[in-house]
């Protein structure tokens, strides 16, 4: 609004339509008093609405100053905001924010890792479609190299697998293909990990 107001200042449109006293600026909503994220891992926030109309929620992940990995779920159908503790006392580093993936069965899978000091990723999966307040137990994906900045996705041409990108092998972009979770929410790396790019 401020940019629009500055661009219209002095014009007849601004004088007739807006005045500083009447202009409204959206201040935003605070998600967390002590939450942070970095832009290297995505999606840090996700909105999912299904075709049947039973799910319409947004998920925003962050890590707090005490190292707790958290997320806020806003359910637009119920008008309810819920803060979810994903993992406590993890590592107080804004590079450890969680990322989100909606699975084909509409459950939400959350990935997170420490900042490069463990060769693994952690994940949890909602037990109810679209509802991260129902997270299952923490699981681990072991790797042999550095892990940080998980970025999961599912390709429309390959809906039977999860692709996970991260900063890994020799600190370079790395990719692996995972199976979809089984009945115990376990996944397996069935291709990779491979380094995607060599920087100089």
Role assignments for model-derived ranges:
Residues 1-9:
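Bacterial N-terminal signal peptides
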Residues 10-15:
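Signal peptide processing junction and immediate N-terminal pro/mature segment
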Residues 16-200:
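Extracellular, repeat-based ectodomains that mediate carbohydrate processing or recognition
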């Amino acid at each position: 609004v401020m940019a629009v107001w500055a661009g219209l200042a002095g014009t007849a449109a601004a004088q007739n339509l807006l005045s500083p006293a009447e202009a409204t600026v959206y201040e935003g909503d605070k998600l967390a008093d002590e939450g942070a994220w970095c832009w290297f891992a995505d999606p840090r926030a996700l909105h999912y609405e299904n075709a049947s109309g039973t799910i319409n929620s947004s998920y925003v992940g962050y890590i707090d100053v005490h190292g707790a990995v958290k997320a806020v779920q806003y359910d637009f159908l119920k008008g309810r905001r819920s803060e979810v503790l994903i993992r406590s006392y993890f590592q107080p580093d804004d590079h450890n924010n969680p990322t989100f993936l909606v699975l084909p069965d509409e459950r939400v899978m959350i990935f997170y890792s420490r900042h490069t000091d463990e060769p693994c990723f952690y994940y949890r999966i909602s037990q109810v479609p679209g509802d991260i307040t129902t997270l299952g137990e923490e699981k681990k994906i072991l790797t042999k190299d550095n892990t940080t900045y998980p970025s999961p996705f599912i390709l429309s041409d390959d809906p039977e697998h999860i692709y996970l990108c991260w900063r890994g092998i020799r600190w370079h972009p790395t990719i692996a293909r995972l199976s979809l979770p089984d009945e115990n929410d376990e996944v397996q790396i069935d291709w990779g990990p491979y380094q995607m790019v060599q920087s100089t």
